[in-house]
């Protein structure tokens, strides 16, 4: 990654750590975490584009159940909604990369070749090159 000089596509956003930290840390600890996080993230190379999958809470709950991780089974809708709001706040800020939002419920990228091809077309047609 550090050697790459061309465009890079990411499906993971370091900033997501801030979203979860805001929900799980007390305000004083979060302030310290955020300051340290921003210092570190500013040293990282940014992707050219971030593929950000969006989904409504019922879809997320269904995916959580399908994944079957015992520690996730009791996640409440309200918590997922707070996480969604946190993501929206970050995505509304000026980020150093293009964000391509894709509704995860529209296409099955994992099981459907057609869905996967649709995702690839969206990425390649984005203006990030």
Briefly describe each language-model feature range.
Residues 17-86:
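A glycine- and Lys/Arg-enriched "phosphate-lid" helix/loop adjacent to the NTP-binding pocket
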